Regions:
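Post-Walker A helix-loop "phosphate-sensing" segment adjacent to the P-loop in P-loop NTPases
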Residues: 433-443
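Hydrophobic positions on the alpha1 helix immediately C-terminal to the Walker A/P-loop
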Residues: 426
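Hydrophobic anchor at the beta1->P-loop junction of P-loop NTPases
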Residues: 415
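Extended, folded cores of ATP/NTP-driven motor/assembly subunits in large transport
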Residues: 1-378
Length: 765
């Protein structure tokens, strides 16, 4: 093995390995399946007779501790450790429902004959580039393994019973006099019996697949890989030279015709009809002609396939059960799984991803027959970074979905769903998860006063803004880091234009003259503060109102008159300097009591306050999560929608992770500009949708009818997750017996049950 990933398997045979990820094949509708199948056929046809390749599907059981470590939330020695322990326990119980106990990986190993490493390298590199490009065309993520990664993979396959890490350095080879084999070899190998083998404390058995079925099914490989036990499936494929293949088939047809003539002569001599020939002969002749036609005119190639299945277990009894289960799957598709008696060692070595086949049992198949073993089943999303968040279980495989939105190109997100679909619950669960596993600040715009209990439980701050409240937010607040530009006033002016449009603008919004006047006045009222930026010099809405009154244009007087009720009238809640200290890590702006007139203005002012916080946090290299409930309210007016879209675009660069929560998809797509919110959101958590919204979303997000069924009349907590280019159906059955569930549920039945339990406890006391 060489550091760059090239392995010299024999004196003149060199191989490399590429690891590839899964894509959703079984979830797709028939047209998409056909497209993937055709793409896979083209992929296989790339390999000529000089390239041998091996597809390896490795499902190895991980110890419980391995997964426990990957999902455990580290304790931080504060009063929330009890909640962290409970959340970790919830994740472990969810994990037990699926088969995440298996680590499933897929590899393609390819090799060429060459006189030397120097001659092999350029060929392998060219083939590697072509393979990665072919995977990319299929929408499959793939990467080449270096020497260390290939050795780690082999070490894992040869030490299935030991959780010990792989320890190796290229610098150790020369001083020790050892080879790479010494660092990956298991403690013991045993090939005493002809029907099984031992590796370490595990026992295994290698079988080969006899393909007897006249037609193959694309579910067969998927069914093997769905087995809930350790398993290695290895497919060695060798392309046959096209000219040789056609010559061989023509020769066979000639032989069959010769035999047919002999049978006809025999029939004439015996005195019966010469058309009566053995049925097998007629069948073989027809099949051979059909095969020749496929090779000559249907872009098919001829391949030789060796299909090996390695079952591994802790003891002989379990191994017998696993082998029986694998055999049953083969029989279901009219094939047979046969043990490689007295060839267990050769079989196991051939199953290792080295691209070297020692089993000379090959079956000739055309491109489409080999391609029917589609190597794609169901995509999984299990990221084990320290900021990965729980999103439910994969509805197809029952495996945990854990994702880190910050790894996306654009972490902005949307939570969409009809009332009662679990929208608010999902948002609260994510907020709690973010609080427990990250150091990010969390800000919530809460138009319906739903988030208070959760925020208070997390020792956060609820800022109640209403006409009767004494909590004030100044919409004129300006942080000197407000914008990337040298002049922070440009973006602030945009915000004030949006605010004035909500207050003044009619059906057509602000007129160009009105926008000019407002912009002029904004620059004037900030002049003193920008020359001496002290808090007491921060302008308020009344300063803007007075400046407008000083202008000569009649439009200025019109705008000032419209502002009057918000300055000196009964709606003057936003005509004060900010008196709330929003430095708490979790802050919720409760604007429920603002009333219809002020609610949209309140949401816009909150958005501006959040932007101020984001700019401050950016200086401290800290992320800010912002959750906007009832987001559609901000998108109805053109200017506020434009400002929201602008902020949505800017958030990513400034370390912000915004999440819009809404049931009104139509408002999200009401204009081309607002569609930018979808285009700038790589994370969409979609719950049950109304029929009109489903059609809009299907078109916007290119969702197939089959995928759409997961958000049609779906139960609470069920839907589709869009994470970058990945689309997964999910189910979130959050345990109801947890403290966290009681804090975040909004269902009246659950809340009344809690009240009843509390009353019982009081009576008992």
């Amino acid at each position: 093995m060489y550091p760059d990933g090239v392995c010299r398997v024999t004196d003149n045979y060199y191989t490399k390995t590429v690891q590839f990820q899964d894509i959703n094949y079984q979830l797709n509708q028939n047209e998409d399946k056909t497209a993937i199948f055709d793409g896979w056929c083209d992929f296989l046809n790339y390999f000529d007779s000089s390239i041998r390749f091996q597809l390896s599907f490795i499902n190895l059981s991980a110890t419980r501790d391995t997964y426990a470590r990957r999902i455990a939330i580290p304790l931080q020695g504060d009063c929330f450790d009890k909640l962290r322990t409970e959340y970790t326990g919830m994740l472990q119980s969810q994990l037990a429902r699926g088969n995440n106990g298996l680590i499933k990986t897929k590899y393609l190993t390819f090799g060429v004959e060459a006189d030397s490493l120097k001659a092999a390298k350029p060929r392998l590199e060219r083939i590697e580039t072509d393979i990665l490009n072919n995977f990319r065309r299929l929408g499959v993520q793939a990467e080449s393994l270096n020497g260390m990664e290939r050795l780690r993979l082999l070490h894992g396959m040869l030490h299935m019973d030991e959780p010990q890490p792989f320890r190796f350095s290229w610098d150790w080879l020369a001083p020790s006099g050892l080879s790479v084999k010494d660092f990956i070899a298991p403690g013991a190998f045993e090939f005493k019996t002809g029907s099984s083998f031992g590796v370490g404390s595990k026992t295994g058995c290698v079988s080969f697949l006899q393909i007897l079925a006249p037609e193959l099914n694309d579910r067969m490989l998927a069914d093997f890989l769905d087995m809930e036990s350790s398993l290695i499936v290895s497919m060695h494929v060798q392309s046959v030279d096209q000219v040789k293949a056609i010559k061989t088939i023509k020769r066979k047809i000639t032989d069959l015709q010769k035999m047919t003539i002999e049978e006809q002569k025999k029939a004439v001599r015996s005195g019966y009809d010469m058309d009566i020939i053995p049925s097998d002969l007629a069948t073989y002749g027809t099949e051979a002609k059909k095969l020749l036609q496929e090779l000559q005119s249907r872009n098919e190639r001829m391949f030789l396939l060796t299909f090996l299945v390695v079952n591994v277990a802790d003891n002989k009894q379990r191994l017998g059960n696993n082998v029986f289960q694998a055999g049953s799957i083969a029989q279901k598709y009219n094939c047979q799984l046969t043990r490689l008696d007295f060839q267990q060692e050769e079989g196991f070595m051939s199953a290792l991803p080295l691209g070297y086949n020692q089993i000379e049992i090959q079956r000739g198949l055309t491109t489409s027959s080999v391609a029917i073993f589609v190597p794609f089943t169901t995509q999984e999303l299990f990221q084990d970074g320290k900021e990965a968040l729980y999103c439910g279980l994969n509805a197809l495989s029952n495996n945990l979905i854990m994702v880190d939105r910050k790894l996306l190109k654009n972490p902005n997100g949307l939570i969409l769903g009809t009332p009662g679909s679990g929208k608010s619950f999902s948002a609260k669960r994510e907020i709690a998860n973010v609080f427990l596993v990250t150091n990010d600040d969390i800000i919530i715009c809460d138009p319906e006063a739903e988030y208070g209990p959760l925020v208070e439980h997390l020792h956060g701050q609820v800022v109640k803004i209403s006409p009767t409240s004494t909590d004030y937010l100044n919409p004129m607040d300006l942080n000197l880091n407000y914008s990337d530009d040298e002049n922070p006033l440009s973006l602030k002016s945009d915000f004030i234009l949006s605010l004035c449009e909500l207050i003044v603008g009619g059906k057509d919004g602000l007129m160009p003259v009105e926008k000019t006047i407002i912009d002029r006045c904004v620059r004037s009222v900030y002049r003193e503060y920008l020359s001496d930026p002290r808090p007491e010099k921060m302008p308020i809405l009344e300063d803007l109102y007075n400046e407008l009154r000083r202008q000569d244009e009649k439009e200025a007087q019109y705008i000032a008159t419209a502002l009057e009720i918000y300055v000196t009238g009964s709606l003057n809640v936003f005509n004060h300097r900010s008196n709330v200290n929003i430095e708490n890590r979790v802050v919720s702006f409760d604007i429920k009591e603002l009333g219809k007139q002020l609610k949209k203005i309140g949401m816009l002012v909150v958005q501006d306050a959040v932007w101020n916080r984001v700019t401050i946090n950016r200086e401290q290299r800290k992320s800010t999560r912002y959750y906007i409930d009832e987001m559609h309210l901000l998108l109805k007016e053109e200017q506020t929608a434009a400002y929201t879209v602008e902020i949505w675009k800017r958030f990513r660069k400034w370390g912000g992770v915004p999440t819009g929560i809404t049931q009104n998809v139509k408002d999200l797509l009401s204009s081309r500009e607002v569609e930018n919110i979808f285009e700038n959101s790589d994370y969409v958590y979609m719950l049950n949708q109304a029929s009109g919204d489903r059609q809009i979303l299907a078109k916007q997000l290119n969702i197939s009818p089959h995928q759409l069924s997961y958000v049609t009349q779906s139960a609470e907590g069920e839907g589709l997750l869009f994470y970058g280019s990945v689309i997964l159906p999910f189910v979130d059955r959050f345990p109801k017996d947890t403290e966290l569930y009681k804090i975040i549920t909004t269902k009246l039945s659950d809340l009344s049950e809690q009240t009843g339990e509390e009353a019982k406890d009081a009576i008992t006391v």
